[in-house]
Swiss-Prot record:
GO terms for biological process: negative regulation of DNA-templated transcription. Belongs to the NrdR family. The lineage of its organism: Bacteria, Pseudomonadati, Pseudomonadota, Alphaproteobacteria, Hyphomicrobiales. Keywords: ATP-binding, DNA-binding, Metal-binding, Nucleotide-binding, Repressor, Transcription, Transcription regulation, Zinc, Zinc-finger. Disulfide bonds: none annotated. Residues 1-11 have a biased composition (Polar residues). The keyword Secreted does not apply. Residues 49-139 form the ATP-cone domain. This is Transcriptional repressor NrdR. Pfam families: ATP-cone (PF03477), Zn_ribbon_NrdR (PF22811). It comes from Bradyrhizobium sp. (strain BTAi1 / ATCC BAA-1182). InterPro entries: ATP-cone_dom (IPR005144), NrdR-like_N (IPR055173), RNR_NrdR-like (IPR003796).
């Protein structure tokens, strides 16, 4: 592993342990050259995914880009970072276990929106506004209407015969 401080390849693992849900290995490392300490995370990757962009271009799937876009939608929201990490891991697992090596950016966006809807309504609306390219206030109203209808649906009492 290359040291992020001096770029030396001579590093040692000092501590290695799984995270709470055992889906990631956290490793504490130290650079032998400059003594810089840093942490790395190791995840299982089920398959190499390629994203088909809207313009038809194909690019490798980037988990970090997914995490950044989710974090942007959650900016200034009080959501536990561990819940965000678990959500992103669940999205990646869903994509990797889908059976396809190529996935459209639209499909990724829809999956992210499903997960954000369960995590935080404001983040869901923020993400939807960028993903669906909102142009007018009525676009926001439509999404807010969907959320309101969804919130009210479980409150309806079941019909008994």
């Amino acid at each position: 592993m290359r040291c992020p401080s001096c770029n030396s390849l001579d590093t040692q693992v000092k501590d290695s342990r799984p995270t709470e849900d055992s889906s990631v290995i956290r490793r504490r490392r130290v650079c032998v050259t400059c003594n810089f300490r840093f942490t790395t995370f190791e995840r299982v990757q089920l398959r190499e995914l390629t994203v088909i962009k809207r313009n038809g271009r194909r690019v490798p799937f980037d988990r970090d880009k997914l995490m950044r876009s989710v974090q942007i939608s959650l900016r200034k929201r009080s959501v536990d970072p561990e819940r965000v990490e678990k959500m992103v891991s669940a999205i990646v697992r869903e994509l990797e276990s889908g059976g396809e090596s190529e996935v459209s950016s639209e499909a990724i966006g829809e999956i992210v929106m499903e997960h954000l809807r369960d995590l935080d309504d404001v983040a869901y609306v923020r993400f939807a506004s960028v993903y669906r390219n909102f142009r007018e206030a009525k676009d926001f109203e439509a999404v807010l209407g969907e959320l309101s209808a969804e919130d009210e649906a479980p409150r309806l009492a079941p019909v008994r015969k």
